[in-house]
């Protein structure tokens, strides 16, 4: 991996934070990704964790992109939409059609039109991530699919894995289907995973 000094960093780019001794004798990866918001003085925000990403097809989707796309879609709705919890996983081998990203969302107040809402999120994702855009336009992936999780579905999921509590959080994105396969049993009846 390429190492950057503070003088080389650019604003708005994700970097992995490495702690080092002044002489560089050892380095430690703390697992966070950061973005610089200012260079004079240097200011950063934590933009995610390096283990939380989706890249099943080379798209390199990170948590901050997913959260921002979802926030944009919610803000663009004419009616109030509130989301209790969500996670995203790749669907690599669907029964029919191209693979896609599968969004499991538990709504307190769902959107009026779930398909339109999904298209808004997908368009925001394409605008945020050029690799995702290339895979959609190149017909390697189809646009994302939303699965509505029943009320308390995520809470029940966390309880079944023994991690219910304030310090435990559902990962926003995962590069595998471990969480998704369990959440399928907590879907609203109108969902039909394919």
Question: Which ranges hold each PLM region?
Answer:
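Active-site glycine/GP-rich loop and adjacent strand/helix microenvironment
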Residues: 1-194
């Amino acid at each position: 991996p390429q190492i950057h000094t503070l003088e080389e960093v650019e604003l708005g780019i994700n970097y992995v934070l490495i702690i080092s001794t002044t002489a560089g004798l050892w380095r430690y990866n703390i697992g966070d990704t950061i973005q610089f918001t200012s260079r004079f003085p240097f200011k950063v925000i934590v933009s995610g964790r390096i283990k939380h990403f989706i890249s099943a097809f080379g798209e390199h989707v990170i948590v901050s992109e997913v959260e921002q796309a979802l926030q944009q879609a919610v803000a663009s709705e004419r009616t109030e939409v509130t989301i209790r919890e969500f996670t995203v996983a790749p669907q690599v081998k669907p029964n029919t059609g191209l693979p896609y990203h599968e969004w499991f969302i538990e709504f307190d107040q769902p959107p009026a039109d779930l398909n339109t809402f999904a298209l808004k999120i997908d368009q925001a994702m394409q605008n945020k991530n050029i690799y995702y855009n290339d895979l959609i336009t190149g017909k390697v992936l189809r646009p994302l699919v939303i699965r509505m999780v029943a009320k308390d579905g995520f809470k029940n999921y966390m309880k079944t894995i023994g991690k219910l509590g304030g310090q435990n959080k559902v990962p926003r994105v995962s590069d595998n289907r471990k969480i998704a396969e369990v959440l399928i049993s907590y879907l609203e009846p109108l969902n039909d995973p394919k």
